[in-house]
C-alpha cells in the first residue's frame, strides 16, 4: 500500500526538516520526502495543503484502565482516542487491577492492543509488586516482554532504599524508573494547589514542596545509582529548576509535563469544578512560565498527557470525593497549539516535545519512531494548525468525558492519523 | 443600621423596601453585595420583631417544606434553622445522616433526589466536605441553604454575627473587628471575612502561623482591610469587636498545635487582654464555647459578651434567608 501526502508543511524535528513538500509512504515505512512526488501507482493521495505533516505523537503517560476499570476506559477506546489525538504510540501506566506487575498482565495488554490493531501500545510495568512499594517486580522478565519502563504512577515509592534498588536493578536492563513525585505525608488530604484560592474554597492545599522534596530525593538517588530516572508530570517552577541543575551535573534524568499543567491554572477549580481536579494539581501562571522555559531550554524532554479517563459518577460528587485526572488525549494538540498561537512556543519545538523528545526517553530501541527519516515507521499525523473547533466530549472516542475544556473553543485540529502506514483516524 | 418595626404597618413598609433579591441559594457570602447584605439585615429586623410578639409565627411559608440535611452532628444550628422554618409556618423534615455514610455508594445527589421527591422546597445542609452545597445547588431544583461545609463557609453564622454587631453599633464602617483562633480551617471565619469586609470593617486575624491563612497577606486586592497578627495583645488592642472561634480538638491530633494548654496560654481571650480593647467592645463566639480554652469563663459570661444574643438573632436571620430565597411576598 502506497500513500502519498501532497503539499503539506512537513515538520520533522529529528532531521530539522520544516518545508512544504510531499511525503511518500510504502509498505508501512516512510520512503521519501520530496517536492512533487509522482502520484503514479499510489492507492491513496492525501492533499495536505495548508496542513502540518509531522511524525505521529508519542505519549509516555496514559491510563487505559484495562484490565480492571473498563467502565472508565478500555484499551480499544483509549487507542481510538489516541489516534484521534494524533498519537501513534502510547505508554499505558500499570495502575490497573490487577496491577501490570507481571508477565500475564503485560501479555494481556499487548495482545489486546494487537487485536485492536490501531496504534502502538508500549506498556509500562510496575516498579513494585502490586504497586505496594515493598518488593521489586520481576523487571528482567518484564523488560524481555517489551515494557518501556517502570512506574508505580499514582503513588510515590516512599522507601528511599527501595527506590535506590529499583534504579540500580532497572539499570541492568537499561530501562527508566518513571516516578510520580509526591511526598506522601505532605500530600495527605490535599485537594488542590495550596494558596489563597484553596483557603477561600476551604480545600486542603498541596504545596510545591510536596513535589519538590520527592524530585530532590529521586535526583539524589539517580546520581548515586547511575540509573535512569524519568520524572512524570512535573508541575512546579521549583521542580523545573531541580531538573535543570541535575542535568547540568550530568545526572541521568528526564522529565515530562502535561498539556494541562502547561495551559491551565488553579483558577479552573473555582466553583468546585471536579473536572479540573488532578494530581499534581493545576498550579499558577508562574509555574506555567517556568514549565514553558523548561521545554525551551531542554530541561523538560517531553509532553505527555497523563490521560486519566473517569466515569461520570467518579466526577459528579463532592470535590473531596472526586477522582483525580483529566481525559487528555483528544484535546492535547489543540490546547497546546494555544501556546503556539500566542507566541509562547514555536511549532517545531512543540512537535519535538511530542515526537523526538519522548522517543529519546524510550531509548535507541525505538529510533524508528518519532521521526520521518526514510526507512522509519510510517507514523504520521496531519493537522490543521488554524482550524477552530469546540470541545464536545459527547464526541470523544475516550469513555472519559472528564475535561475542564468541555465547551471551549480551541484552534488546531488533527485531520488524519497514520500508524504503521495504515490510516487509523480521519476527522469526519 | 437595623430597622426594627414598631407597628404592623412598619413591618409591611420595611419589607416592601427590600427589593431586588436575586439569590436562589445561600452558599457563601463571596457573591453577596453590600446592598444584599443590607437586605438581609433589614428583613432580619422584621423577623426579630415577629419573634418578640406573643404569637411568634407568620404564615409566609405555609405549605412549603423545608428539609434539614445534616452530615455532621449539630444541635444549635439545626434547631435554629428548624425554629426559623416553623416560625414562618413551613413544614420541617429533619434528616440526620451519619458522617461515616459519606461515600460514593450513598451519594449526596441520591439523597437530595429523595428529598425532592418527598416535596422539599428548600434544603438546609451541613456537610463535612467543602463545596458540597455547590454540588447540590447545581444538580437539584430546591433552594439550598448552606449551614456549614467543611472548612469553606457558614454564611448564616456570619450574617447573624453582622446582625448582632449592628444591634449595638450604628455601622460596621471602620470598626476594628478581631477574630482569634483557627482562622485557616474555620468556615465561620471565612464567611465572616467576606461579610465583615463588605460591610466596611477592618479585620484582624489572630492565630499561630499553623492556623493562619497566609495567602491573605499576599493578595491584598481582594481583602485590603485584613491584617494578620500572631500577638493577641496587638490583635485585641483598640478592637470594637473581639470574636473567638471554637478550637477543634482534632487540630492537636493533626499536628497543628502542640496542645490545648499551650494554645490557651498564648491565644485565650481573658479579662486582662480584653481590657486592651475599646471599653464598649463586644465579645462574640459562634458557640459552643470551650470555656477557658479560647475564652476565659469570666469573658464568656462577662458584661461585654453578646454570645446569647447571637443565638437569638440567628433564628431571625435564618427566617430572613428563608423568606428572601422563597420569593414569598406575604408575611
UniProtKB/Swiss-Prot annotation, chain B:
Pathway: Pyrimidine metabolism; UMP biosynthesis via de novo pathway; (S)-dihydroorotate from bicarbonate: step 2/3. Gene3D superfamilies: Aspartate/ornithine carbamoyltransferase (3.40.50.1370). Keywords: Pyrimidine biosynthesis, Transferase. GO terms for biological process: 'de novo' pyrimidine nucleobase biosynthetic process; 'de novo' UMP biosynthetic process; amino acid metabolic process. It holds the Pfam family OTCace_N. One of its GO terms (cellular component) is cytosol. Carbamoyl phosphate binds at residues 76-77, 126, 154, 157, 287-288. It catalyses: carbamoyl phosphate + L-aspartate = N-carbamoyl-L-aspartate + phosphate + H(+). Its EC number is 2.1.3.2. The keyword Transferase applies. Signal peptide: none annotated. SUPFAM superfamilies: Aspartate/ornithine carbamoyltransferase. One of its GO terms (molecular function) is amino acid binding. L-aspartate binds at residues 104, 187, 246. It comes from the Bacteria. Heterododecamer (2C3:3R2) of six catalytic PyrB chains organized as two trimers (C3), and six regulatory PyrI chains organized as three dimers (R2). Belongs to the aspartate/ornithine carbamoyltransferase superfamily. ATCase family. HAMAP family: Asp_carb_tr (MF_00001). Catalyzes the condensation of carbamoyl phosphate and aspartate to form carbamoyl aspartate and inorganic phosphate, the committed step in the de novo pyrimidine nucleotide biosynthesis pathway. This is Aspartate carbamoyltransferase catalytic subunit. It comes from Dehalococcoides mccartyi (strain CBDB1). The gene is pyrB.
Amino acid at each position: 500500500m502506497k500513500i502519498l501526502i501532497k503539499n503539506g508543511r512537513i515538520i520533522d524535528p529529528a532531521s530539522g526538516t520544516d518545508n512544504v513538500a510531499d511525503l511518500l509512504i510504502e509498505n508501512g515505512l516512510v520512503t521519501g520526502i520530496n517536492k512533487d512526488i509522482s502520484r503514479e501507482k499510489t492507492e491513496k493521495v492525501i492533499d495536505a495543503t495548508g496542513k502540518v505533516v509531522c511524525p505521529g505523537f508519542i505519549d509516555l503517560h496514559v491510563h487505559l484502565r484495562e484490565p480492571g476499570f473498563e467502565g472508565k476506559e478500555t484499551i480499544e477506546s483509549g487507542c481510538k482516542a489516541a489516534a484521534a489525538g494524533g498519537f501513534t504510540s502510547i505508554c499505558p501506566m500499570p495502575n490497573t487491577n490487577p496491577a501490570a506487575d507481571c508477565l500475564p498482565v503485560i501479555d494481556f495488554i499487548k495482545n489486546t492492543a494487537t487485536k485492536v490493531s490501531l496504534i502502538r501500545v508500549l506498556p509500562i510495568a510496575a516498579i513494585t509488586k502490586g504497586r505496594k512499594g515493598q518488593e521489586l517486580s520481576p523487571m528482567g522478565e518484564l523488560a524481555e516482554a517489551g515494557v518501556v519502563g517502570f512506574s508505580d504512577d499514582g503513588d510515590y515509592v516512599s522507601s528511599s532504599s527501595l527506590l535506590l534498588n529499583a534504579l540500580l536493578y532497572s539499570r541492568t536492563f537499561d530501562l527508566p524508573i518513571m516516578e510520580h513525585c509526591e511526598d506522601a505525608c505532605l500530600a495527605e488530604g490535599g485537594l488542590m494547589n495550596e494558596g489563597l484560592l484553596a483557603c477561600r474554597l476551604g480545600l486542603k492545599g498541596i504545596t510545591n514542596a510536596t513535589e519538590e522534596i520527592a524530585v530532590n530525593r529521586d535526583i539524589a538517588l539517580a546520581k548515586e545509582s547511575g540509573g535512569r530516572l524519568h520524572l512524570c508530570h512535573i508541575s512546579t517552577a521549583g521542580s523545573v529548576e531541580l531538573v535543570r541543575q541535575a542535568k547540568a551535573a550530568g545526572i541521568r534524568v528526564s522529565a515530562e509535563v502535561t498539556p494541562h499543567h502547561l495551559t491551565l491554572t488553579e483558577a479552573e477549580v473555582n466553583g468546585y469544578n471536579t473536572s479540573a481536579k488532578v494530581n499534581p494539581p493545576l498550579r499558577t501562571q508562574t509555574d506555567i512560565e517556568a514549565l514553558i522555559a523548561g521545554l525551551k531550554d531542554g530541561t523538560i524532554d517531553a509532553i505527555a498527557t497523563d490521560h486519566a479517563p473517569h466515569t461520570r459518577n467518579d466526577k459528579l460528587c463532592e470535590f473531596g470525593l472526586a477522582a483525580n485526572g483529566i481525559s487528555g488525549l483528544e484535546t492535547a494538540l489543540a490546547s497546546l497549539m494555544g501556546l503556539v498561537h500566542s507566541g509562547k512556543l514555536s511549532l517545531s519545538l512543540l512537535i519535538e516535545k511530542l515526537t523526538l523528545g519522548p522517543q529519546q526517553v524510550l531509548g535507541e530501541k525505538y529510533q524508528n519512531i518519532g521521526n520521518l527519516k526514510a526507512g522509519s515507521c510510517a507514523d504520521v499525523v496531519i493537522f490543521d494548525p488554524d482550524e477552530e473547533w469546540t470541545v464536545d466530549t459527547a464526541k470523544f472516542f475516550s469513555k472519559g468525558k472528564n475535561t475542564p475544556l468541555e465547551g471551549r473553543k480551541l484552534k488546531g485540529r488533527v485531520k488524519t492519523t497514520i500508524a504503521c502506514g495504515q490510516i487509523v483516524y480521519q476527522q469526519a | 443600621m437595623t430597622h426594627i418595626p414598631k407597628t404592623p404597618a412598619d413591618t409591611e413598609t420595611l419589607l416592601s423596601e427590600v427589593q431586588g433579591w436575586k439569590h436562589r441559594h445561600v452558599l457563601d457570602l463571596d457573591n453577596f453585595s453590600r446592598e444584599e447584605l443590607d437586605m438581609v439585615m433589614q428583613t432580619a429586623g422584621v423577623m426579630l420583631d415577629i419573634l418578640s410578639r406573643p404569637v411568634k409565627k407568620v404564615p409566609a411559608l405555609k405549605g412549603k417544606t423545608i428539609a434539614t440535611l445534616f452530615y455532621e452532628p449539630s444541635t444549635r444550628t439545626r434547631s435554629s434553622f428548624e425554629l426559623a422554618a416553623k416560625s414562618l409556618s413551613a413544614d420541617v423534615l429533619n434528616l440526620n445522616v451519619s458522617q461515616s455514610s459519606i461515600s460514593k455508594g450513598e451519594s449526596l445527589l441520591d439523597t437530595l433526589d429523595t428529598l425532592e421527591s418527598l416535596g422539599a422546597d428548600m434544603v438546609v445542609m451541613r456537610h463535612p466536605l467543602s463545596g458540597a452545597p455547590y454540588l447540590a445547588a447545581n444538580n437539584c431544583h430546591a433552594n439550598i441553604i448552606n449551614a456549614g461545609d467543611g472548612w469553606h463557609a457558614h454564611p448564616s453564622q456570619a450574617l447573624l454575627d453582622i446582625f448582632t454587631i449592628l444591634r449595638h453599633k450604628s455601622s460596621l464602617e471602620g470598626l476594628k473587628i478581631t477574630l482569634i483562633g483557627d482562622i485557616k480551617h474555620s468556615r465561620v471565619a471565612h464567611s465572616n471575612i467576606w461579610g465583615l469586609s463588605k460591610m466596611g470593617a477592618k479585620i484582624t486575624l489572630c492565630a499561630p502561623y499553623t492556623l493562619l491563612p497566609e495567602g491573605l497577606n499576599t493578595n491584598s486586592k481582594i481583602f485590603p482591610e485584613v491584617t494578620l497578627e500572631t500577638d493577641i495583645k496587638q490583635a485585641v488592642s483598640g478592637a470594637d469587636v473581639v470574636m473567638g472561634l471554637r478550637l477543634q480538638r482534632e487540630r492537636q491530633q493533626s499536628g497543628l498545635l502542640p496542645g490545648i494548654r499551650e494554645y490557651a496560654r498564648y491565644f485565650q481571650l481573658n479579662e486582662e487582654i480584653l481590657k486592651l480593647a475599646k471599653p464598649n467592645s463586644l465579645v462574640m463566639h459562634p458557640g459552643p464555647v470551650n470555656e477557658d480554652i479560647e475564652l476565659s469563663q469570666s469573658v464568656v459570661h462577662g458584661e461585654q459578651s453578646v454570645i446569647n444574643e447571637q443565638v437569638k438573632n440567628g433564628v431571625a436571620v435564618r427566617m430572613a434567608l428563608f423568606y428572601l430565597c422563597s420569593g414569598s411576598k406575604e408575611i
